[in-house]
């Protein structure tokens, strides 16, 4: 019976399949025993030999045959697969493996035994006149045995090629690769099945002594019926015996060869004992490498020891009372047995890093471990680029996380980033990392990573400068690796910025939120970002500013509503954007085609609106409409059969003229635009490409002027030729070209040569020198000083260990004409220095001779609301203070003399008013295209502006109610009409498509 997934009914039946195997053994025993009489006793020596052989063959077993990490049932004839969430399915497939497909182990052994026993029994009269006799006896025995056994795998299942599926390998090295639902003959891989041996010895010794007192008595009760005299009867009056014995066994099992992943690459390696050392053949995926020594001072691979010893003794005393047939026996006895079994040598993972360690145990209560040093193998250690910069990494074994994640892994412990310059500032960037809250999902059987990661930026003395703490969702499969939290703190753990990200499961088909408290599983859902919140703290760790964003989704994960609430407690900066989507009418899985979009403020006033028509088969936008108060701007698009945009028709102007641009593409790749035509005016520009690197070889403007470009083999620009020049206009050289040899200490540079028409053979060169991280540290320019050619060198830029520019030397002249030479030591030593806070904001700039400018940051209030505050104080103690809102917009500026200027904005960030220190306010009004429509100035009065749908300003009315009219030919201004004085009117004439002398598209005449 198959049940749906997930199973939603209780009491679903489950069926168990037995693991079966069969063992066949053949045994030959040979033995001999002899009895020899000796003076009233008997001596019996014995001995024997035994030999056995056979095999154990598995008939049915469990292996994950298809890689779903659920065990499937395999037998001689077929494989029965399990379902994705457990339980047997009805899928049964036969396999094509020749011979016995399951595990087969052969074994053989020999054993020897020996023994000897002695017995003695005598009767001795007490006296010549007495009828009593003494009965004396004794016995002794000695036995021993020894044996040796060997076993070896004939066929095994193991994943030899690292694809996660068990393959079948035979003793001869032949492999059948598992393809999940069938097998393929892989030829010879290499032989390395398990092989082992065992030795055992045993022995025993025992002995005893007995004594008895006998007498001949006439028992009255035994008189005969015929009244004749009864004959005497021998009666045991007293008897005693003493016996003792000792025995022992000792068994040692050794594994001589086995497969185990020694180096952690996911491939089982072959480890074996050989000549007193442990050797390994590393698995390379398609066979084994040659033998290497794993441990030269160890010879055991896997050893178990079991011993058992016992001692026993007994005393027996018996006696009779007179002639009565009653016997009393006292029989005290005792014994002691001691047995022990332990593993003396084992390859097993002790520290939880997933790698086998070598563990030995000689004495009870003591264990020695040789940890596997392969944990960092194959982990990236360092990267060095051609410029000498790079980074080095080190790793450590993660802490044990307990039940939530019992596995330990190698994690990044430290990261050093260096720029490759030896003579500059101490600027190596150092980071260390901490991890916590790892989680292992036992249902999915995979680790979801760490829930908490801390990144520490370190000072040059390795102390913590600042820390970024990040939290990730790692409890559910669909939510894994999503960041839910971020916190910035300094070295004293003082908070600066805290961020929260909230994700919820939403149904793919509807966008509805899944109730995680009641849902059996999340079903067809996805993790959707539902909310963002950012908190900003002051110096006392009080929250001063909070910003929030909210997201709402529809079907297929489409965002249907976005709310930027801005700063908490401030409604004026809130904006709500709603979106609708086109249906997938053509069933092309094009579910994310936006149909319309609206933006509104907190009063529900419309700020922006647009919608579009699309091609349902290809998802192409055919028409885009943007709505203003009285106009609608329509832009149309056309495409070719390759999906390239071939025509754009812009919005109509006031005369209903629409600009049209047509695009043509290359005929090989159909990807690069090679021709652009302005249809109304007939202007054409062209571009030719090097299709190998996708870069232009030449561009021709609408006047026929050609710019030519050349590149090196690495695709870097090496020359530019302007239309009026010959040879080159700009030439570019680089510190390394294709095939060059890199020399240690070379500084990366790039040189630009400007052609100088007055000195054709001596171009003006500018060389930029960078460090190994690509940061510019110096610039050298050709210059002439006092009639001599020299270099004007910019001061070196030094960076600190956080990548910030902290020192800038002043420029100087350098007689060294080697333009690529990096001059780290300046002759004048003049430099400006800069210090920063935790958030990389400048706090102090010191110019040469001690001139300082200080900056401070915090929070300030305006109108009862908190804002970001920054201040700058110059050397004369003049301070400029600025208040900025959560969007980064300046809301107030206080200049020296306590002169205050204030600014206000709408939700779109458009300036709506500015109030000067005289408390005079200028206001601004915008249309739904973002164009200013009105400005009210305290002196100039009210200015109004009108536009057509194409965005051209068609009129401007000033504060005196005088209107200036603007006229256009498509999108080109042709006439300006002023009020009252027509003589001031202006008319512009443009060059048409036939105009010469670079006049096409340009103003060739102005009439006013």
Task: Describe every region a protein language model picked out.
Residues 50-60, 100-107, 111-113, 145-155, ...:
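Repeat-based blade/solenoid architectures
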Residues 58-65, 153-160, 255-262, 343-350, ...:
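Beta-propeller blade termini
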Residues 1-14, 78-101, 173-193, 276-297, ...:
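Beta-propeller blade repeat segments, especially FG-GAP/WD-type strand-to-loop junctions
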Residues 67-76, 162-171, 264-273, 352-361:
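Acidic/hydrophobic-patterned starts of short beta strands in beta-sheet-rich repeat architectures
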Residues 29-46, 109, 113-143, 205-245, ...:
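Short hydrophobic membrane-inserting alpha-helices and related fusion/pore-forming segments
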Residues 65, 74, 160, 169, ...:
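Fold-core signature of tandem repeat domains
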Residues 379-384, 391-395, 402, 411-419, ...:
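Beta-strand elements of repeat-based all-beta scaffolds
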């Amino acid at each position: 019976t198959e049940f749906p997934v997930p199973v939603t009914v209780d009491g679903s039946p489950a069926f168990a399949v037995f693991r079966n195997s069969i063992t066949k053994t053949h045994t030959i025993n040979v033995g001999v025993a002899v009895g020899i009489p000796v003076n009233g006793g008997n001596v019996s020596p014995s001995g024997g030999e035994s030999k056995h052989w056979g095999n154990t063959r598995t008939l049915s077993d469990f292996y994950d045959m298809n890689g779903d990490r659920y065990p499937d049932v395999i037998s001689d004839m077929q494989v029965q697969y399990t379902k994705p969430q457990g339980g047997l399915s009805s899928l049964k497939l036969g396999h094509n493996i020749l011979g016995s497909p399951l595990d087969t182990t052969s074994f053989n052994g020999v054993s020897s035994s020996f023994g000897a026993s002695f017995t003695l029994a005598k009767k001795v009269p007490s006296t010549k006149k007495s009828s009593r006799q003494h009965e004396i006896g004794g016995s002794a025995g000695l036995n021993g045995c020894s044996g040796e056994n060997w076993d070896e795998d004939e066929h095994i299942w193991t994943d030899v090629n690292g694809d996660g599926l068990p393959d079948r390998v035979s003793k001869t090295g032949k492999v059948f690769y598992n393809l999940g639902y069938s097998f393929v003959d892989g030829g010879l891989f290499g032989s390395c099945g398990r092989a082992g041996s065992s030795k055992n010895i045993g022995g025993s010794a025992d002995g005893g002594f007995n004594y008895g007192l006998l007498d001949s008595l006439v028992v009255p009760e035994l008189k005969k019926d015929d009244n004749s005299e009864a004959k005497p009867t021998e009666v045991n009056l007293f008897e005693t015996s003493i016996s003792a014995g000792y025995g022992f066994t000792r068994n040692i099992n050794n594994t001589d060869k086995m497969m185990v992943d020694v180096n952690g690459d996911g491939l089982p390696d072959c480890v074996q004992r050989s000549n007193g050392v442990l050797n390994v053949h590393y698995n390379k995926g398609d066979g084994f490498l040659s033998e290497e020594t794993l441990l030269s001072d160890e010879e055991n691979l896997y050893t178990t020891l079991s011993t058992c010893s016992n001692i026993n003794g007994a005393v027996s005393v018996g006696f009779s009372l007179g002639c009565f047939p009653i016997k009393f026996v006292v029989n005290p006895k005792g014994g002691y047995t001691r047995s022990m079994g332990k593993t003396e040598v084992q390859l097993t993972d002790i520290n939880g890093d997933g790698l086998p360690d070598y563990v030995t145990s000689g004495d009870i209560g003591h264990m020695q471990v040789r940890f596997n040093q392969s944990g960092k193998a194959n982990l990236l250690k360092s990267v060095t680029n051609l410029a000498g910069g790079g980074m080095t990494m080190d790793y450590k074994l993660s802490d044990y996380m307990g039940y939530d994640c019992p596995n330990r892994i190698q994690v990044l412990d430290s990261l050093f980033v260096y720029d490759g310059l030896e003579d500059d500032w101490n600027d190596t960037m150092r980071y260390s990392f901490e991890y916590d809250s790892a989680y292992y999902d036992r249902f999915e059987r995979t680790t979801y990573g760490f829930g908490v990661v801390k990144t520490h930026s370190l000072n040059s003395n390795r102390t913590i400068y600042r820390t970024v703490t990040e939290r990730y969702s790692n409890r559910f499969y669909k939510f894994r690796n999503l960041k839910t939290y971020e916190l910035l703190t300094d070295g004293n753990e003082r908070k600066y910025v805290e961020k929260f990200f909230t994700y919820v499961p939403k149904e793919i088909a509807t966008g509805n939120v899944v109730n995680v408290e009641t849902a059996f599983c999340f079903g067809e859902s996805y993790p959707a970002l539902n909310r963002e919140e950012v908190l900003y703290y002051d110096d006392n760790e009080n929250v001063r500013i909070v910003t929030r964003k909210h997201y709402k989704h529809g079907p297929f994960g489409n965002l249907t509503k976005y709310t930027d609430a801005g700063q908490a407690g401030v409604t004026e900066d809130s904006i709500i954007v709603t979106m609708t989507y086109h249906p997938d009418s053509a069933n092309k899985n094009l579910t994310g085609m936006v149909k319309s979009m609206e933006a509104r403020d907190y009063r529900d006033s419309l700020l922006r609106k647009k919608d579009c028509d699309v091609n349902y088969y290809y998802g192409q936008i055919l028409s885009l409409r943007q709505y203003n108060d009285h106009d609608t701007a329509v832009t149309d698009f056309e495409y070719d059969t390759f999906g390239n945009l071939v025509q754009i028709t812009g919005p109509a102007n006031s005369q209903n003229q629409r600009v049209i641009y047509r695009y043509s593409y290359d005929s090989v790749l159909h990807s690069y635009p090679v021709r652009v035509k302005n249809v109304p005016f007939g202007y054409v520009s062209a571009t030719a490409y090097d299709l190998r690197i996708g870069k232009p070889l030449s561009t021709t403007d609408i006047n026929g002027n050609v710019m030519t470009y050349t590149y090196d083999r690495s695709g870097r620009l090496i020359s530019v030729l302007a239309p009026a020049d010959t040879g080159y206009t700009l030439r570019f050289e680089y510190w390394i070209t294709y095939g060059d040899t890199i020399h240690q200490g070379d500084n990366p540079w790039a040189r630009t040569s400007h052609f100088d028409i007055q000195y054709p053979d001596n171009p003006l060169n500018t060389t930029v020198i960078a460090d190994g991280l690509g940061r510019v540290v110096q610039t050298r320019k050709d210059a002439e000083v006092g009639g001599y050619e020299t270099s004007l060198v910019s001061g070196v830029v030094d960076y600190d260990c956080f990548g910030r520019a902290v020192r800038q030397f002043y420029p100087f002249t350098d007689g060294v004409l080697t333009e690529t030479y990096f001059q780290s030591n300046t002759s004048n030593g003049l430099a400006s220095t800069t210090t920063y806070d935790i958030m990389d904001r400048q706090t102090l700039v010191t110019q040469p001779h001690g001139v300082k400018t200080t900056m401070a940051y915090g929070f300030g209030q305006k109108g009862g609301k908190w804002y970001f505050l920054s201040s700058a104080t110059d050397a004369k103690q003049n301070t400029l203070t600025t208040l900025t809102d959560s969007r980064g917009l300046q809301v107030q500026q206080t200049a020296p003399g306590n002169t205050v200027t204030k600014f206000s904005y709408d939700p779109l960030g458009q300036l709506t008013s500015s109030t000067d220190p005289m408390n005079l306010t200028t206001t601004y009004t915008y249309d739904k295209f973002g164009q200013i429509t009105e400005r009210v100035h305290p002196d100039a009065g009210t200015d109004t502006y009108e536009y057509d749908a194409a965005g051209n300003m068609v009129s401007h009315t000033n504060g005196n109610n005088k209107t200036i009219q603007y006229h256009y030919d498509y999108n080109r201004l042709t006439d300006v009409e002023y009020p009252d004085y027509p003589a001031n009117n202006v008319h512009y004439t443009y060059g048409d498509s036939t105009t010469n002398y670079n006049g096409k598209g340009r103003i060739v005449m102005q009439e006013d």
